[in-house]
Structures are given as structure tokens and as C-alpha cells.
Amino acid sequence: GFDALHETPYYAKYGKPMLETKLRAVENAAAAGLAIVLVCCVIPGENDGELGGIVEYARQHMPAVKGVYFQPISYFGIYPEDKMRRITIPEVIRKVSEQHPDVSVQDFGPGSYDHSQCSFNAAYAQDKTGRLMPLTRFAPRKAAEDAVHRVRRNLQTAWTPSARRTLTIGGMAFQDAWNIDLMRVKRCSIQIIQKDGALVPLCSKYLSGCNGAKLFPGIG
């Protein structure tokens, strides 16, 4: 993930410096004409003060960078429960808005189809001065029967390589064994197809028990 613009969070997460590798990857992808989405795992006390800087980096590298995706940390496998640090979607949104002058909490809303506690998003266009202007703040938000198809079309447009200077900021809170919510699982719009054709909600697919055992092992 693109977790910060300095090395400390990478040492905490990977045990080695990674920033230069990340920056080169962005440069090479941009040179190849690829659309780039920066994905950040948000860890309280490690990089939750870096969110605005990541958005600013994305703004400076438009139109190659099309989005920033924040994922509050989740815990899988065997992990000491007393050492877990949590951050919620509202806290992520508030920190981004506090750390970047062009971003406001009013710009964000939940996904059109998912449970409201699963995901969040906002869309921006860059004006002639370079500022990010919110598009979602003025758009009506309502449930729609064709929401899944609309989201797919919008992502194909937003994350396709182009000279269009637009940026999406969003994220998803993955569930783990300590905070699994069955109501969220029932509303999941991302299903993983098993070898036998069964559909498994995304968070359930990669969920592991407190002992580290996966409920649905294997890729498919």
C-alpha cells in the first residue's frame, strides 16, 4: 500500500524502507499511461497523520493518479487482541478533511448499495488554479435499484487512463473476527465465486478466526 510519504510507517508494517519503491512505481505507471489508485492502510499512531499529505501527492500527480483509497486497519490470522488499534470511517474522513484544505466532511457519503458502515466516497475535479472542487457535495444521494451497474460504469470512467483531471477519494472498512457484523455481511455487494459456484461475501471470504484459521481457505 501507499501508506505515507516517509519511511516510518513502512518500517512498522514491512520492517524495511519502501517509499522509494512506491514512488518509482507511480512514476513508471504514469509514464506507461496507466491509471493509478493509491491504496493506504490507515493505522492509528503510525500514519493517520499522513492522510492529507497522500491526497496532496495525488493532486500533484493528476491526471495519472485517479483515486486515493483509504482502508482502516483490520486484523487477520493470530494477533494479540490487547495490541489492536482501531480507526473508524468517520475518523478517517475527519482526519482527511482536517489535513487537506480542499477536502470537507460534507463531500463524502456512503456507497450507493453497500451497508452504510462499509464504504465511503467523494469525487473531485481540479479547477484552473489546481484546487480540488467537490462534485459529490452537490449531487443528490439516494438509493437506486441499478446502483451496482452505475458504480461499475462510474469506476470504469473515473479509473480509466485519460487527461481528465478528476480524483476520487474513498475507502472500505474490512471486517475481522473481532468486529464482524452480520447485517453488513448480508448487504455485501462484492461476492467471491467459489469453485462450487457458491457466492461468499468479501469480508467473509478472507475472515480468519482468533486462532488464525480461515473460514474459506483457498483462492476460489
What is each stretch, according to the model?
Residues N121-G220:
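Radical SAM enzyme core and accessory elements
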Residues P17-E20, E56-R59, R86-P90, C210-G212, ...:
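Short, low-complexity, polar/charged sequence segments that are solvent-exposed and flexible
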Residues K95:
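Glycine- and acidic-residue-rich phosphate-binding/metal-coordinating active-site segment common to enzymes
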Residues L5, I43, Y75, A198, ...:
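Short, solvent-exposed loop/turn segments at secondary-structure junctions
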Residues T8-Y10, G45, V65-E91, S104-K128:
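Flexible glycine/acidic-rich beta-alpha junction loops that bind and position SAM and/or redox cofactors
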Residues Y57-H61, S112-S116, L182-M183, Q191-K195:
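A general structural signal for short secondary-structure junctions and capping/turn motifs
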Residues G1-P72:
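Radical SAM/AdoMet-radical enzyme domain recognition
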